[in-house]
């Protein structure tokens, strides 16, 4: 017995073995002869009273067969021990070697108990009693601590086994364990029942509260609707409660009980040992087991909660796995269980029954469309406060109707209840089909009732909605008709008044223009005659004046000299002569200056006269004034010819491209780039005339900045010069070659009618070849617009007009729509905020100069925007006043504080 013990049981075929696998007994096999088996049968009958509790448990729970078998094994083992004790008086042979070997084996680690497997009981091959057997260690630890002698049975010979000493208190200990387990099970069942009752009470309270709220809101509904809704709710509650009970019984039922109590070993680590002499090491190991089990149960509890949340509070999904083919980690597939789940009804067998139900259930889908239509009508009417009460009632009725519909989840719950109680037998299948047919009939009845209720509710709601729609349509029609009549009347009155006013103003302005034209013609004709007379008279009068003034001066000198001679005495003659010489020199200088001025004026007058004569010769129309005055066009040309000589900026049209009015150059246009300025500054990027440092000539740039105050360099005119009203020789914007572009942001958004290109006159300019020849104008809605062409124009230098105006193509707007047929076409012209000028060619010079570019047009009135601007200006003015008041208050407070400080000092 010192090593591994291997009995030769093949020589004794009449022997039978009995496994002893309790937690308080060694895992060895005790072989018995037929004589001992008779004793075993007698003791079983005698000790039937000890197994009464197990029979009660078996009868109370039909699925507790494993618990019953385990208790039966315990009782059989106890009876065998009692019989062996009766024979111990005759065979009191002890084996010290066996006890010593078991004491040596008890030094093995106690933690190997968890890895012990006793599934090889039925094998008839060699059986090894190794020193690492955990159950033998546990047995020896428990019996070694007791004061009583231990007894074992020796099977080393083929004869009857030798009976050793056995522990007498083992029977009591096993009974205590069974009672404790039963008590724990009863307590757990009671706790579960209490929890279920509490949950049911809470659900009932919540449902009662919901019913009270619904009843308060649905007092106006009919009694039939209330009765149907309450019956549907009760049925739904019963279905939910039954499904919850079946699910709980499914997951806490027989498989788990069999898992814990089906085997002879007890895996529960929280049992208390009555032996007071256990060592501290065993207590520590038990505490470690408890911690592990607590961790496992906490993880399982958290997983269950997550599963419930993942199902969106609709309950646990019912699955129908085929346990015969697949293996999962669920407790139903554990090896310790002997239940065969392949006998259950599969999902495939229930498909035809369920399909019949869902085919009938497709009828309700058509009612969902009606619900959607009704909800849309409710949303349309919910915007008005008049129909709030009716809309709330309709919403509540729809909720009740929707609750009455059966879902697939509820059908699955009903099927799961039936499957939990029936196996794969033919009789049970027929019973299950009968139950399903009954349930389907009940469902069809419920559907028919719900259909009738739905039809009634839908007809009532549709009638109410139709009435509401008709009322609202009538009200809207009345309001719209009244507003349309008012609008038409106001339009007629306004149109008549405006037409009369416009006609009056037009006639008045036309008459005034005719009068002004006549006055201008008469005035200009008189001015021309006066100019001719003045020119002739000025030539003669200027010469006469000069001679007369010279003579007068000489006479004055003579008189003055005579007077001086008389007044001066003989003593001061020398001084007088010196003074006389000085005075004469001063007078001569003054005379020379005045004479030079007069000669210059005379020369200028002669030059002007010659120019006028040459102009008259070049224009024969001026000679025949009598013929040209008869037509207005001739008069206008005559006036323009005369004004061209003296001035050049008198077109009397608003320029929206004027820089002083708010126009500017747009450098950030998306599709147009401003050309580079000519000439560029050395050591600087010419860009747009602003002069920025270039990467290659950075040193020259800083050198020029440092020496600019000593050696000033000429700067080119920027592109903004074309927006300046002052036009002088050289004050132009130039760019290289004859092709260039520039974008102008107008002062205001206008409808463009005309464009004016201005250059200095050929009589003044050094070279007229730098003037632009052909150019194109684009109208832009904003800086990122491609633009629309307003026309291509040519600036003619052969005509004696340095300021030339061109009419622009009219572009219709795409946004505005004309509703009135009498509306003018000018009101539908597109407005532009930017203008792009593209020079196509010049008159042959290496660069091109633009002196001034003008844009003419008119603003289209927008009364809404004007009102917004007025409101914004008023608000800003009020805010400024408030700010000024606050500033004054702060200043007053500061002054008061300063006075107080000065008084304190």
Curated annotation (Swiss-Prot):
Residues 107-116 have a biased composition (Basic and acidic residues). Residues 117-126 have a biased composition (Acidic residues). It comes from the Eukaryota. Disruption phenotype: Shows significant reduced growth. Residues 312-905 are perinuclear space. One of its GO terms (molecular function) is chromatin binding. The chain crosses the membrane at residues 291-311. Residues 1-290 are nuclear. Keywords: Cell cycle, Cell division, Coiled coil, Membrane, Mitosis, Nucleus, Transmembrane, Transmembrane helix. GO terms for cellular component: nuclear envelope; nuclear inner membrane; nuclear outer membrane; nucleoplasm. It is found in: Nucleus membrane. Residues 1-21, 41-166, 207-242 are annotated as: Disordered. It is a single-pass membrane protein. Residues 129-146 have a biased composition (Polar residues). Its main location: nucleus. Residues 41-67, 75-101, 207-227 have a biased composition (Low complexity). One of its GO terms (biological process) is nucleus organization. InterPro entries: SUN1-5, SUN_dom. Residues 662-860 form the SUN domain. May have an important role in defining the spacing of the nuclear envelope lumen. Essential for centrosome attachment to the nucleus, maintenance of correct ploidy, proper mitosis, association of the centromere cluster with the centrosome and the maintenance of genome stability. Requires direct chromatin binding for inner nuclear membrane targeting. This is Sun domain-containing protein 1. It comes from Dictyostelium discoideum. The gene is sun1.
